Every structure is written in structure tokens, then in C-alpha cells.
Amino acid sequence: MSVRKILRMGDSILRQVSIPVTENELQTKEFKKLIRDMFDTMRHAEGVGLAAPQIGILKQIVVVGSEDNERYPDTPNVPERVILNPIITPLTKDTSGFWEGCLSVPGMRGYVERPNKIRMQWMDEKGDRFDETIDGYKAVVYQHECDHLSGILYVDRLKDTKLFGFNDTLDSGRNVLD
């Protein structure tokens, strides 16, 4: 198990745009180790997802996955998945709001509204290509993590800063994504 340091808001790397992963990289030992390290880091931090920029790697790589967890008792599980070079297209103007958190913004959360139905095209770690319609909580998770690849944090999407604060100060029982 190799857990990497998660960068925190204020680190300039988190504000940079990531570059695509090439198919030639997929078979390298370095790439395979990076994917394992990302999953190890995400699980160790008890997150639902992790983007490569959060560990200082400016590549278009996201890992997601969650199981039943006391930290997220009211959210559905998210299957483990490696997402490379994602393209997200909103399919509706309807939005869903969630209290989001982020491993790069520890101890805080904010209310963010996002399109509740998206089309996502991506490649996995084997080079297989996918084109899927995604909705609900899973769409929120994917959009949150993929934002990191464009240098965007969830705090940039807050519409009302009164709905942003420390976990231990905000009312309990709100859904949190991080």
C-alpha cells in the first residue's frame, strides 16, 4: 500500500489544467503504480474519488469508488472505476444540490448544484472506451472529481457562501461528498 500526500486548497497545482493520458502510457509500470497509489490514497482518506492533480500529477486521471460507509450513510455506493481523459456533457438544465466536501479542502463543505444528468465519455486503464449517461449522485461524484482536471474546486461552484463552512460547525446530517 502506497499512500500519497493529498494537496490542499492554496497549492497552485490544484488550479492547473491536466494533460490527457496517452494510450502508450497505459502499459507502463509507472502508470499502473500510480493507479494503485491513487486507490490506496483515496481509501486511506475515506474518500469517494480522487483526481491525479490532488496528489500533484497533472494528468487526466480520476479514480472513484465507495462502499457502505458510516461517513456516507445516505448515499448510494459508487462502483470502483478508473476514468481517463473524460469529456462531460450536461444533458439537462435540471440540477441536483449536494453538500460537497473535498479531500483537498479538509474539514469543510459547501452546497453545490450540478446538472443531474450527464453524458460522460472516457477511457479506462485498459484503453477501453466508454460513453455513458449518468444521473443522480454518481453524476455529482464524477463532475466533482473531473472538475479537478480543469483546475476547478467545488468552492468555485458555490452560489451562496453562506452555505459553506466547517463540518463541525454546520448542521449535521447533510450529505457530503469528498
From Swiss-Prot:
The keyword Hydrolase applies. The keyword Transport does not apply. Binds 1 Fe(2+) ion. It catalyses: N-terminal N-formyl-L-methionyl-[peptide] + H2O = N-terminal L-methionyl-[peptide] + formate. Its EC number is 3.5.1.88. Its cofactor is Fe(2+). It comes from Leptospira borgpetersenii serovar Hardjo-bovis (strain JB197). Belongs to the polypeptide deformylase family. It comes from the Bacteria. This is Peptide deformylase. InterPro entries: Peptide_deformylase, Peptide_deformylase_sf. Removes the formyl group from the N-terminal Met of newly synthesized proteins. Requires at least a dipeptide for an efficient rate of reaction. N-terminal L-methionine is a prerequisite for activity but the enzyme has broad specificity at other positions. Keywords: Hydrolase, Iron, Metal-binding, Protein biosynthesis. One of its GO terms (biological process) is translation. The gene is def. GO terms for molecular function: metal ion binding; peptide deformylase activity. Pfam families: Pep_deformylase (PF01327). Fe cation binds at residues 102, 144, 148. The active site is at 145.
